[in-house]
Amino acid sequence: MFSSISRGFAKSETGDTFSFSFKSSWLLSLLVLWGPPLTTAKSAADYYVRSLPGAPDGPLLKMHAGHIEVDPQNNGNLFFWHYQNRHIANRQRTVIWLNGGPGCSSMDGALMEVGPYRLKDNLTLEYNEGSWDEFANLLFVDQPVGTGFSYVNTDSYLHELDEMSAHFIIFLDKFFELFPEYEGDDIYLAGESYAGQHIPYIAKAILDRNKNAVSPWNLRGLLIGNGWISPADQYPSYLTFAYEEGLIKEDSRTAKSLEVLQSVCQSKLETGGKDRIHIGDCETVLQELLSKTLDSDNKCYNMYDIRLRDTVPSCGMNWPQDLKDVKPYLRRADVVKALNINPEKKSGWEECSGAVSSSFLPQKSVPAVQLLPSLLESGISVLLFSGDKDLICNHVGTEQLINNMKWGGGVGFETSPGVWAPRHDWTFEGEPAGIYQHARNLTYVLLYNSSHMAPYDLPRQTRDMLDRFMKVDIASIGGSPADSRIDGEKLPQTSVGGHPNSTAAEEQEKERMKQAEWKAYAKSGEAVLVVVIIGVSVWGFFIWRSRQRHRRYQGLYHEDVSGASVLERFHNKRSGQDVEAGDFDESELDDLHSPDMAREHYTVGEDSDEDDVNRQHQRTTINPS
């Protein structure tokens, strides 16, 4: 941006060097002083997604994407994709979604589960009617470094959960510097699978940060689906689940051979293994279970959805079927450009990184289940949900985790000594949906007919689950509420689908954005531009007045028309551009899109960042997710 401005002052229109007066030298000094921030510091506009190839017809959803540096020494950058909420309920909320692995991209969640779009094919996006961005801002992050679109030097992959959470706090600090309007939101950390380790560690790191923070973050809840949270409870569950689901017959030869392996695993757990996150002898149980249950076509069970079969040795790694479209879509050059991927990211997008996974084998970190009691006791609400057809992180293990955990003066779902909270039948739109159970800040939901990636199978039901957990109040919004019932009784209204905002909600949002406006200006460097423009204006006015005053004194002041041309060229250079766009020239904007991209949809004027300001004064084996 500075180079664009300073070029306007270098020459007159005829090419002659412009001779600065004392006043113009003062202005140039001001520009030089402020130059480095203008050229190096990114603003929110640098992350703005102006178009998205294959998007449905109509205005594009408001979104930002790109990299935030978390480890300068090792070139560590985390990629994020953020969607602004489509409707405003009673409170402003942000849901941060993480997939597992470790080393599997949260683009799984964005394009196959809870994001606003799903792929119809590798060229075309369609709306996800159960998207989680309806009443919450939605933030997907590829982490740890090296995952998905994120990157780091190849000798600097992470090993421990504390390292991961430290990076994440740095990421959030910088994210909120760029987007201060979201810093006061209620924050919910959500994800699945190995994110069952990541999420509690990040939550603890946030609470630790808040102790000394000038602006504490409003962490309200955690949502973990089919989570790898307690290996000591999950490893022994494989055989139990296989028996219950009829994958293996008890007392069969196969069962007996697997029980021998299970006893070795149990011995490891009882001799220090309960404080470990990965135990090789226990991993063997699942591997052998899959290899000993091949069908007549020599296909194994899909470990993420036992209703399906897959080729050996994948056994689920080729699932879900949408994955065949996600990878080529995210490797398209126009998509990479639209999502503001840094040139330093040399390799194309991969769902799961083997290098990250093989490096992230914590030796010092304790299982995240040991962090849950203190989080619950601190007032953080926790929702554990399980798709009932998942094998690898099955619901039997999750239920055993809850039964064994002590917090808040009780064990498991005790409501009083020896008395447990009842299980409630949940129906959604007239069909059995699952089971709800709750006690002392912990909620458990078993989702019928769903896999390791429950939102993939049941987008509307899981959205309803989210809204209830966040206590979304849609009274002021309207629309047709979903028919969701517990034990036959209709629950407080939630809605799934598009609905207009209420006037009151819009006014509340405008006021919130107005309060954040100057903070956003100051952090993005726009205030600097305002100062420069004011300086130019004052200087120009002073010169004009002086010339008018002394015009009658012939020869005393020689009128140099180049001064006027500077201001004119400056105005012409900047007009028609986003005020936050730096030196992003309009011709460069045209270069973003190739001529054959006629089906892409661009945001209309009122959806740009600049107009918001004007308008609002506004996948180890745990992978693939």
Curated annotation (Swiss-Prot):
Annotated signal peptide: 1-41
Region (Disordered): 480-511, 574-625
A GO BP entry: apoptotic process
Active site (catalytic residues): 193, 390, 452
Protein name as annotated: Pheromone-processing carboxypeptidase kex1
Biased composition, class Polar residues, residue ranges: 492-505
Membrane topology, Cytoplasmic segments: 545-625
Keywords: Apoptosis, Carboxypeptidase, Glycoprotein, Golgi apparatus, Hydrolase, Membrane, Protease, Signal, Transmembrane, Transmembrane helix
GO CC terms, sorted: membrane; trans-Golgi network
Topology term for the membrane: Single-pass type I membrane protein
Catalytic activity: Preferential release of a C-terminal arginine or lysine residue
Family of the protein in this entry: Belongs to the peptidase S10 family.
Family matches, as InterPro entries: AB_hydrolase_fold (IPR029058), Peptidase_S10 (IPR001563), Ser_caboxypep_ser_AS (IPR018202)
Pfam family, one: Peptidase_S10
An example Gene Ontology molecular-function term: serine-type carboxypeptidase activity
